[in-house]
Amino acid sequence: MPAAIASAAIAPVLTEPRIRAEQVTQLVLGETATITDLSGEWRRVCTHTDGYDGWTHAGYLCEASEQQVDQWRERATAWSEGASINIGQLRQPLPLRARVELQADTVLLPDGRRGRVISGSVRTLEQLTLAARAKAPERWALEYFAGSPYEWGGVTPWGVDCSGLVQTTFAVRGVGLPRDSAQQVFHGSAISFEATQPGDLLFFCGESTSNITHVAFAGEADTLIHSTLACGGTLVEPWLPGTRAGTLRHRLVAVRRLEDR
C-alpha cells in the first residue's frame, strides 16, 4: 500500500475528507502513515505511531512507497525539542516531537530540504529519552507544556489535549501509548487511589457517561497536571474538595502506573 511522511510542521488528521471536519489527532513533521483510501486531494491514513485512522490533505504529506518510508524511519532518529532551523533565508520552527535526520551539523527534512539549528535543540531519541527519564514524567510534562493552549486532537506544545499530553510525554520516555484516554487506561499497573503517587495517571469518566473522557497526571500535594479546556490549556491545579478540579473526584474511574518511582 502507498505510504506517506508528514512534511508540514503539523498535519491535522480529521474525521472526514473536508477542511471543516473534526480534528482527532495530528501527524507531526517526520511521522509516517499508511495511505488506505483517496478522496480527491485528501488521503485516509493509518498512523504508524499509534494506528489512528483519519483523513489529512495531500498538501501536508510527502507520498512514498512503504520501502521509502521504512528507510526514512531508519534514518530519522532525531527529535526536535522545539527547535528552529534556518533553510536559506527562512526560519522554520520544528515542534516538539518532529522527527528529522541529523547529518553532521545539518538537519534533513522529509521533503529533502536541509537546515541548521539556530535555537532550541535536536537530539537523537536515545539522548532525549535519557534526559526525559532523569525527570519525573509529570515534571517533564510541565516543563515542556505548561501554558500550552488546549486543542482537541493536538499532540504538541503548539496545542494539546489531555491524552495527547500523556502520549507525547511517555513517547519521549520510550513508552508507546494509544492516542485516546479510553485506550491508555489499559496500560500500566492498576493502583488504588490511596496508593497514588506523583506521575501516576488518573482517568475520569464524563459528566453524563461512564466512558473515560479525561486523563491527568497526579502531582505533588493533591494536584493534577493536565490539559483541560476549562482552564484553556496545560497547568497544575489543586483538586482538593471545594476546588474547581475537585469536582473531578467523583468521576475518577482508574489510577494506572506506568513507571515505578
PLM features per residue range, with description:
Residues Q23, Q89-L90, S189-S192:
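Short, conserved secondary-structure segments in the cores of folded domains
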Residues M1-L14, Q68-A83, T168-Q183:
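Short, basic/aromatic beta-hairpin or loop at an interaction surface
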Residues P149, V155, C205-H214, T228-G233:
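Active-site loop architecture of trypsin-fold serine endopeptidases
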Residues M1-P2, R18, T25, E31-T32, ...:
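Boundary regions of SH3-family modules and the immediately adjacent low-complexity/disordered segments
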Residues P149-P198:
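Catalytic cysteine-centered active-site loop
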Residues R43-C46, H214-A218:
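Short beta-strand-centered aromatic/proline hotspots
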Residues E63, L125, S189, G219-R261:
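Aromatic- and glycine-rich peptidoglycan recognition patches
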